[in-house]
Amino acid sequence: MKLCGFEVGLNQPLFLIAGPCVIESEQLQMDTAGTLKEITASLGIAFIFKSSFDKANRSSGSTFRGPGIERGLEILAKVKRELGVPILTDIHSEDQIAQVASVVDVLQTPAFLCRQTDFIRAVAQSGLPVNIKKGQFLAPGDMKNVIDKARAAAREKGLNEDNFMACERGVSFGYNNLVSDMRSLAIMRDTGAPVVFDATHSVQLPGGQGTSSGGQREMVPVLARAAVAVGVAGLFMETHPDPSKALSDGPNAVPLKHMRALLETLVALDAVTKKNGFLENSFAA
């Protein structure tokens, strides 16, 4: 798959989608994106900056959601223009698609909306690449139906059918908990789409703090290493200069100061994992 000028897939080096969970301020976005650009460039990692203008699925209606679509897109456009990095952001309704697609390079659909057929079709017909997140309630094999819906919608408009990624972000395991079944990363390859692993939302404890979600950020490196060892096209990781002060998802954000060391390990592991290909299909009965 061609994505923002580079190729992604199991036969390509690992790429990274990273940034703060939500747009807190213009300065935070510029500083974080600049640091990530420097780190990824030095490590030879293709990089897409992400952040949200609106967190529409917060645990509580009283918590910070973001600057909104108008101001949020202004800030993302500045990051793109001044730093020269491609931008990903998520959308939550069909009426946002055209406006957001005019600014960003990649769209993302929330995990909760992966079964909303009309929404998936509308996003697919934007013409932009789309990172489609698997719902916390969905079996990995069911993502093929979701990707097929997107491809069919693109085909109807004469658009690129190979413009979609399948993103794993954990599965609900009882109340206020998620687990990551690493088999899902191999199963989701059957969609024919590049598979991305969301290493930060996978350690989230949804609603675990009453009016906000908790998280186990110390487990991000553990799951990220495991996913890269299985073999994925890319990683999604939210990061913040000071997660303890982040306005959204701080408990599962990677401290920005540790991002370089983590990525150095993951790049080395990715090279080993992909060096000799994958034997899974040969092992099938």
From Swiss-Prot:
InterPro entries: Aldolase_TIM, DAHP1/KDSA, KDO8P_synthase. GO terms for molecular function: 3-deoxy-8-phosphooctulonate synthase activity. This is 2-dehydro-3-deoxyphosphooctonate aldolase. Its EC number is 2.5.1.55. It catalyses: D-arabinose 5-phosphate + phosphoenolpyruvate + H2O = 3-deoxy-alpha-D-manno-2-octulosonate-8-phosphate + phosphate. The keyword Transferase applies. It is an enzyme of class 2 (transferase). It comes from the Bacteria. PANTHER family: PHOSPHO-2-DEHYDRO-3-DEOXYHEPTONATE ALDOLASE. Transmembrane segments: none annotated. Disulfide bonds: none annotated. It comes from Albidiferax ferrireducens (strain ATCC BAA-621 / DSM 15236 / T118). Pfam families: DAHP_synth_1. Belongs to the KdsA family. It is found in: Cytoplasm. The gene is kdsA. GO terms for cellular component: cytoplasm. One of its GO terms (biological process) is keto-3-deoxy-D-manno-octulosonic acid biosynthetic process. SUPFAM superfamilies: Aldolase (SSF51569). Keywords: Cytoplasm, Lipopolysaccharide biosynthesis, Transferase. Pathway: Carbohydrate biosynthesis; 3-deoxy-D-manno-octulosonate biosynthesis; 3-deoxy-D-manno-octulosonate from D-ribulose 5-phosphate: step 2/3; Bacterial outer membrane biogenesis; lipopolysaccharide biosynthesis.
